[in-house]
Regions:
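Amphipathic alpha-helical protein-protein interaction surfaces
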Residues: 18, 28-31, 81, 108, ...
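Short, solvent-exposed helix-to-loop capping segments enriched in aromatics
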Residues: 24-37, 54-66, 138
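Generic structural detector for well-ordered beta-strands
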Residues: 12-16, 43, 60, 75, ...
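Glycine-rich portal/gate segments that line the openings of hydrophobic small-molecule binding cavities
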Residues: 43-94, 106-111, 145-157
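Beta-strand/loop substructures that line and gate deep hydrophobic ligand-binding cavities in soluble
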Residues: 88-145, 150
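Residues that form or flank phosphate/diphosphate-binding pockets in enzymes
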Residues: 17, 52, 67, 95-98, ...
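Hydrophobic ligand-binding cavity/cleft-lining segments
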Residues: 1-49, 149
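Exposed loop/turn and edge beta-strand positions of beta-sandwich/beta-sheet ligand-binding modules
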Residues: 9, 70, 97
Length: 157
Protein backbone atom coordinates (compact mmCIF):
# COMPACT_ATOMS: atom_id res chain seq x y z
CA UNK A 1 0.00 0.00 0.00
CA UNK A 2 1.30 3.42 -0.97
CA UNK A 3 1.06 6.42 1.31
CA UNK A 4 -1.29 8.17 -1.11
CA UNK A 5 -3.77 5.28 -1.40
CA UNK A 6 -6.97 4.93 0.56
CA UNK A 7 -7.93 1.76 2.39
CA UNK A 8 -11.40 0.74 1.28
CA UNK A 9 -13.79 -2.18 1.13
CA UNK A 10 -17.46 -3.08 0.78
CA UNK A 11 -20.06 -5.77 1.36
CA UNK A 12 -23.46 -6.30 -0.29
CA UNK A 13 -26.48 -8.21 1.00
CA UNK A 14 -29.84 -8.65 -0.74
CA UNK A 15 -32.87 -7.92 1.46
CA UNK A 16 -36.46 -8.88 0.73
CA UNK A 17 -37.72 -5.43 1.73
CA UNK A 18 -38.29 -2.05 0.15
CA UNK A 19 -35.40 0.39 -0.08
CA UNK A 20 -37.40 2.93 1.95
CA UNK A 21 -37.86 0.48 4.82
CA UNK A 22 -34.16 -0.41 4.84
CA UNK A 23 -33.11 3.25 4.57
CA UNK A 24 -35.29 4.21 7.54
CA UNK A 25 -33.42 1.71 9.74
CA UNK A 26 -29.97 2.70 8.49
CA UNK A 27 -30.43 6.49 8.57
CA UNK A 28 -31.74 6.45 12.15
CA UNK A 29 -28.36 6.43 13.88
CA UNK A 30 -30.05 5.49 17.15
CA UNK A 31 -30.39 2.00 15.65
CA UNK A 32 -26.67 1.53 15.06
CA UNK A 33 -26.14 -0.42 18.28
CA UNK A 34 -28.67 -3.02 17.12
CA UNK A 35 -26.66 -3.84 14.02
CA UNK A 36 -22.97 -2.90 14.28
CA UNK A 37 -20.51 -5.26 15.96
CA UNK A 38 -18.39 -2.28 17.11
CA UNK A 39 -20.55 0.83 17.44
CA UNK A 40 -22.89 0.15 20.33
CA UNK A 41 -24.76 3.46 20.47
CA UNK A 42 -25.07 6.80 18.70
CA UNK A 43 -26.88 10.08 19.23
CA UNK A 44 -27.57 13.19 17.19
CA UNK A 45 -25.63 16.29 18.22
CA UNK A 46 -26.59 19.96 18.43
CA UNK A 47 -29.84 20.81 16.68
CA UNK A 48 -29.84 17.57 14.66
CA UNK A 49 -32.73 15.23 15.41
CA UNK A 50 -32.59 13.06 12.30
CA UNK A 51 -30.74 12.44 9.07
CA UNK A 52 -29.85 15.50 6.96
CA UNK A 53 -26.78 16.58 5.02
CA UNK A 54 -24.30 18.13 7.42
CA UNK A 55 -26.04 16.80 10.55
CA UNK A 56 -23.63 15.57 13.21
CA UNK A 57 -23.85 12.63 15.53
CA UNK A 58 -21.62 10.90 18.03
CA UNK A 59 -20.90 7.19 17.88
CA UNK A 60 -19.72 5.16 20.86
CA UNK A 61 -17.24 2.54 19.62
CA UNK A 62 -15.88 -0.63 21.21
CA UNK A 63 -13.01 -1.40 18.85
CA UNK A 64 -12.88 -5.06 17.77
CA UNK A 65 -15.83 -5.71 20.12
CA UNK A 66 -13.44 -5.74 23.12
CA UNK A 67 -11.88 -2.27 23.31
CA UNK A 68 -10.61 0.31 23.56
CA UNK A 69 -13.87 2.24 23.95
CA UNK A 70 -14.11 5.76 22.54
CA UNK A 71 -16.47 8.33 20.99
CA UNK A 72 -16.31 9.54 17.41
CA UNK A 73 -17.96 12.61 15.93
CA UNK A 74 -19.53 11.96 12.53
CA UNK A 75 -21.04 14.19 9.86
CA UNK A 76 -23.72 13.08 7.39
CA UNK A 77 -22.32 13.33 3.84
CA UNK A 78 -25.06 11.59 1.81
CA UNK A 79 -28.75 11.57 2.63
CA UNK A 80 -31.19 10.51 -0.06
CA UNK A 81 -34.16 8.54 1.31
CA UNK A 82 -34.47 5.09 -0.21
CA UNK A 83 -31.15 5.44 -2.08
CA UNK A 84 -28.15 6.29 0.06
CA UNK A 85 -26.89 7.34 3.46
CA UNK A 86 -23.29 8.17 4.26
CA UNK A 87 -21.22 9.80 6.94
CA UNK A 88 -17.65 10.81 7.64
CA UNK A 89 -15.87 10.04 10.90
CA UNK A 90 -14.18 13.32 11.70
CA UNK A 91 -10.70 13.92 13.09
CA UNK A 92 -10.97 17.58 14.00
CA UNK A 93 -12.26 19.26 10.85
CA UNK A 94 -11.01 16.49 8.52
CA UNK A 95 -12.82 13.34 7.38
CA UNK A 96 -10.68 10.38 8.44
CA UNK A 97 -13.01 7.54 7.48
CA UNK A 98 -16.10 7.52 5.28
CA UNK A 99 -18.96 5.02 5.64
CA UNK A 100 -21.62 4.72 2.98
CA UNK A 101 -24.78 2.72 2.33
CA UNK A 102 -26.12 2.45 -1.21
CA UNK A 103 -29.54 0.88 -1.83
CA UNK A 104 -30.58 -0.49 -5.22
CA UNK A 105 -33.89 -2.18 -6.12
CA UNK A 106 -33.29 -5.79 -7.18
CA UNK A 107 -35.41 -8.94 -7.58
CA UNK A 108 -38.40 -7.56 -5.68
CA UNK A 109 -36.21 -6.36 -2.81
CA UNK A 110 -33.12 -4.26 -2.28
CA UNK A 111 -29.40 -4.83 -2.69
CA UNK A 112 -27.72 -2.95 0.15
CA UNK A 113 -24.02 -2.16 -0.12
CA UNK A 114 -22.10 -0.83 2.85
CA UNK A 115 -18.63 0.54 2.16
CA UNK A 116 -15.83 2.29 3.96
CA UNK A 117 -12.96 4.42 2.74
CA UNK A 118 -10.14 5.44 5.03
CA UNK A 119 -8.80 8.68 3.57
CA UNK A 120 -5.19 8.70 2.33
CA UNK A 121 -2.76 9.99 4.92
CA UNK A 122 1.00 9.72 5.48
CA UNK A 123 0.49 7.41 8.47
CA UNK A 124 -1.72 4.97 6.52
CA UNK A 125 1.21 3.17 4.87
CA UNK A 126 2.85 2.61 8.26
CA UNK A 127 -0.49 1.49 9.72
CA UNK A 128 -0.84 -0.99 6.84
CA UNK A 129 2.64 -2.43 7.50
CA UNK A 130 1.85 -2.98 11.17
CA UNK A 131 -1.40 -4.84 10.68
CA UNK A 132 -3.74 -2.37 8.99
CA UNK A 133 -4.47 -4.97 6.31
CA UNK A 134 -6.17 -6.99 9.07
CA UNK A 135 -8.42 -4.00 9.77
CA UNK A 136 -9.67 -4.00 6.19
CA UNK A 137 -10.57 -7.68 6.47
CA UNK A 138 -12.25 -7.04 9.84
CA UNK A 139 -14.27 -4.11 8.43
CA UNK A 140 -15.56 -6.20 5.51
CA UNK A 141 -16.52 -9.03 7.87
CA UNK A 142 -18.24 -6.59 10.25
CA UNK A 143 -20.09 -4.84 7.40
CA UNK A 144 -21.44 -8.23 6.32
CA UNK A 145 -22.58 -8.91 9.91
CA UNK A 146 -24.20 -5.47 10.11
CA UNK A 147 -26.08 -5.95 6.83
CA UNK A 148 -27.28 -9.41 7.81
CA UNK A 149 -28.58 -8.06 11.13
CA UNK A 150 -30.47 -5.33 9.27
CA UNK A 151 -31.79 -7.97 6.87
CA UNK A 152 -33.11 -10.06 9.78
CA UNK A 153 -35.05 -7.07 11.13
CA UNK A 154 -36.51 -5.79 7.84
CA UNK A 155 -37.49 -9.26 6.65
CA UNK A 156 -39.14 -10.13 9.97
CA UNK A 157 -41.69 -7.40 9.44
Amino acid sequence: MCLDQAMEGSATVHMAASADKVWDLIANVGNIGRFSPEVFEAEWLGDASGPALGAKFRGHVRRNEIGPVYWTTCEVTACEPGREFGFAVMLGDRAANNWHYRLAPSDGGTDVTESFRLSPAPWLGVYWLFGGFLRKRRNVRDMTKTLNRIKDVVEAG
